[in-house]
Amino acid sequence: MKFSDIMKKAREKNLGRKGIKRRIKNIRKTEYGKYWQDVEKGTDGQWYAKDGTSFFYNGTVADMHPLTHEDFLNFIKSKDDIKTVLEVGCGDGFYPIKFKNLFENKEYLGLDIGEPAINFCKENSNFNFICDDFIKMESSKKYDLIFSHAVIDHVYDIDSFLSRIVTSCKKYAYISAYRGYFPDLEDHKMHYDNSRGTYRSNLSAKKIKEVLVTNELSQDEFSIKGQKDGILLDQPYSEGLTGISTIIKIERKSNSKK
């Protein structure tokens, strides 16, 4: 039941303040991640056409944030010692499907919380994919490269998500946060979108640094920068955005020793 409906019924029944509070507490919180489970069903826009072609999610980074996409390609192509790769929040497989050459002779694993997206990946790619919650999943495996685009903005525990990337990364990590660059925020500013069951967060650069240092990365092993991402600010999908993304890069000096 919507908040407005609860208030209307409360007024009709002349409930007092305590009665209204009890009604508000009964508003059901949408389960986290519901949006990524429902999109295939068409409840909030289709991901997949009838022929299996993705036209909603696929290419989000390249099409909406082309400068971030270009920067990521330069990052991964500059490394010649990557054998294992984990993509956290692979969606419907833009990189392993459209840019599969990036992972030739590499062990790639795509992970996403959305089962429809993972099913699509398995049907359209020969790489490995699993549906799981990265923060909670039971795995001790480490990867040479971990990358994640526009996912950390939506997770329910930003610090745990980032910490898990650091502890699972043997050499390199590339993380993009598209909602802006916030160097003055003391802590992350999180907003829960109950209609979708997901968060929309502004990440504190100060807090990111604190988490990285706490996880025993030295100052010369990471960078946190605000970079132009190339999004078209005159489009409806860019409402509330600045055209600047937060880019976190990790390059361990001692690699697998940590």
State where each predicted segment sits:
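Conserved class I S-adenosyl-L-methionine
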Residues: 174-202
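A short glycine-rich, Lys/Arg-flanked "PGG" loop and its adjoining helix->strand segment in the class I
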Residues: 160-173
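Conserved S-adenosyl-L-methionine
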Residues: 218-230
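Conserved N-terminal segment of class I S-adenosyl-L-methionine
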Residues: 1-137, 149, 246, 255-257
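A short acidic, Gly/Pro-enriched loop at the edge of an enzyme's catalytic core
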Residues: 138-145
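Core SAM-dependent methyltransferase catalytic element
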Residues: 228-258
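Short alpha-helix
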Residues: 198-216
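A short SAM/SAH-binding and catalytic strip from SAM-dependent methyltransferases
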Residues: 145-156
